[in-house]
Amino acid sequence: VPSRTQVVARQIRAATAARRPVVFLGPVMGGGPDGAAMKAHVAAGLPFIAGESAALTFADDLDRVRARGVEVVADAEASALAAEAVPAEASGAAGASGTADASDVGATGDVEATGDASRDTRPVVVRSGDLDVEGLRQVLQGLGVSPCFDAVCVAVQDHGFTSHGSNRVARFAFWEQALSDRRPLVDLFWPADDVPATFTRLRAATALATELGEGAPVLAADTGPAALYGAMPESGDAVLVNAGNGHTVCVVARDGRLAGVFEHHTSALDGASLERFLRRFLAGELTSAEVREDGGHGAVLAPGALEGLAGPMLVTGPRRDLLRGSGLALEFAAPHGDMMLTGCYGLLRAAGERGLAGRRRGGTS
């Protein structure tokens, strides 16, 4: 199943190819491919209108979004515009593959005007959100499965937002507080009402999960802790690494409690630099200042965190090959034989420990 960021990006690109304005509305969601598609749409000289909540997908500062050529309007105004526009799924702008027609794309990938005056030029509505609630319901119903959930678990990567200072520092402060309190890793999974306000994307995804669950309990987490918890052994003692597409996180867990954490952006790392950071982190030599100077988030290790800790470092995540062939003593973790579901297993494990699993409502888990 493609990520929502990819789906939304395809819908925007299709509208660009059809030379149609876009109305983008809904909650804040993950960026990346959708942001690139928005920039290409604006560069093609086409209007891109976004409700304030959806516009936060592209930057936490709406003035920065406006500077990129997006017309940012109140959510209510975006909804009114959407009422007179065509949904992306029904616009005909996206075909079965959701991609632009080849006749509209030049050799460089730029969108070209065809000069076809008969084209429908009404705006296309593109809905934001990390979960497509109605789409998921339709898939389940199409398979004959009742969309009645015992519980819904959701995880997204969220840098966090602060109106003052650095988002990178604010995100790492969440790790530092958890370590200072020596909290169990399971405490980094929150019921819907307890998701910290700084995690705006996760709160938005949690609201969609609540809508999907229709009253079922919801558990939410960042993707980093979800994957790490899925890979953590029953003993609760381990050095764990999740080499994700966005972030790489290493934690030291003792008796299931956080005793150390290092976090960086995966795009800034190669195998040699990651191994070097990990060695210095586990030696107690790496500082948050050094990591931040390199564009990462930070590093902190509790005194005595590694005393008596035996066994190899456990590595998971889609970018785990960064450490393949390294000189570190490590093991590639694939819970239940499927590395790409490590985060899902972490969510289910936390749900079970939080008492959410097994609450039968006669439907789907």
PLM region spans:
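Nucleotide/phosphate-binding catalytic cleft detector across ATP-hydrolyzing
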Residues: 1-238, 264-272, 284-365
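A beta-strand-loop signature enriched in Asp, Gly, Thr, and Trp
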Residues: 251-283
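Gly/Thr-rich phosphate-binding beta-strand-loop-beta motif of the actin/hexokinase/Hsp70
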Residues: 236-254
